[in-house]
Amino acid sequence: YEVTSPVPGDNVPIQLNNKGFFAWFEPICKLYMLPKYNELDLTPFFAPFFMVFFGLCLGDSGYGLFLFLGATLYRLFAKNISATMRPVLSLIQVLAASTFFCGLLTGTFFGANIYDIDLPFFQKMKETLFMDNNDMFQLSLILGVVQILFGMVLKAVNQGIQGGIKYAVAT
């Protein structure tokens, strides 16, 4: 056999090497597509957006609390959790926390509006956290624009890494 340096057309194996928080999102990135040998690993850039959008899509503090407690209890009481299951449980906890806090923005707990409860605690939360439909629409538009612009910048950086500055400027 012959050992050569990889060229752009080669199909070489890819090993993602993220640490800590970002490593938890690698299984999700692997579901879509691994980067090529000479491309950026987008996992660190993908993770925060996925976390926020997952929370906004599920958006119920009751579900978030349920998922968080379920993953935490499983982690505490299960014996011999496999090495592949630990990061999945951590990912569930992070996504559940995002869901819980996004549920506080909308004021839902298992589908019920918690801000209709006439208790001072919930009314204070409503004044500080609650977002009505217009606020949520504006937030989603802003997040969408930020994500698209950020993706375009990442594409330009990736093009610059692969082909040079003239390709980065052209994107």
Summary of predicted features, one role per range:
Residues 1-171:
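Conserved, carboxylate-rich catalytic/transport cores that coordinate ions
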